[in-house]
Amino acid sequence: MAKAETVSKARERIRAWRRDPVQFARDCFGVEPDAWQVDAMRSLGGDPNPARRLVMKACTGPGKSATLARMGWHRLACFAGKGEHPKGAALSITADNLKDNLWAELAKWQARSPFLTEAFQWTKERIYAKEHPETWFLSARSFAKDADSESIGRALSGLHSQYPFILLDETGDMPTAVGRAAAQIFTGSPADAAIIQAGNPTSTSGLLYESCMTAAHQWTVITITADPNDPKRTPRVSKEHAQEMIDTYGRDNPWVMATILGLFPPGGFNSLFGADEVDAAMKRFYRDDQLGNAAVILGGDVARQGDDSSAVCKRRGRQAYPIRTLRIPDTTLVAQQFVQEKARHDADAF
């Protein structure tokens, strides 16, 4: 009877943890989550949700990988049913980055929990339940730098479960195709599924930007900031240092926006022009007499591998023209198209 009561109490506690990830973190890891961590974790609790999407857009140094690791343990420990076990995949911008950051954090936080240490086995490529090693796991995944969407899809395959989840770290520069591949976990009518990602807002062309801006209506977006004026700022970044950087460079400085405020710079972290500036240039129109004898210049971008298209663009003086895309896998044929474009426009240079 004593053993049955113990099992019953354990099940009750896990059910409570499933609904309250914040309490799970307190009980298992002995930590008091920061204000932004509470907001993020609460989005992963409550009633069952077959399509959870959480994105954490972070300044530098707030502990986002540690938070992502705790969320991973919450999914592993608390989401299971009779004959149904959680299956997860973890992915970062590179295999080495995953190994050195998120995967190391998973090991660190497991070591702080006697419950997780007893129930799960951590290895370099896989974390699994000791009693169900084949069906209850979180595996480390990776993809080649030049991988196309099909290859990325294979990197995130094999998560057939009622409780699938995917952890994505450093998504600032991660290809948007990763997001589309990850969303496959929602297609099997799961009981509760989650994609959880975190990254720094250094690029306006990666998965993080797409999730926070273009597809923000699909995601719970948490902005993690070191802004001294924000009551929910991370306490893990010195307020004095943050204020000094703001005073020195200004709030609209791209570096300050990305690394201190947790915001996307208008032109990206390392971009000469922002997307808004390019769009504005494309919408301008000049008459021929305003362009005078301006040279006709063509520019080309060859998509040698991956899921992108090649492109060719015409410019005459200050006038930019619509970009023509070419979905041609053979680079020799792309070169022939470029030659034909130069002749068609009587271009002065390519």
Model-predicted regions and their roles:
Residues 325-327:
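Short, solvent-exposed loop/turn segments at secondary-structure boundaries
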Residues 329-331:
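Short coil/turn segments at the loop-to-beta-strand junctions that recur within blades
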Residues 1-300, 312-322, 333, 340, ...:
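Phosphate/NTP-binding elements of NTP-utilizing enzymes
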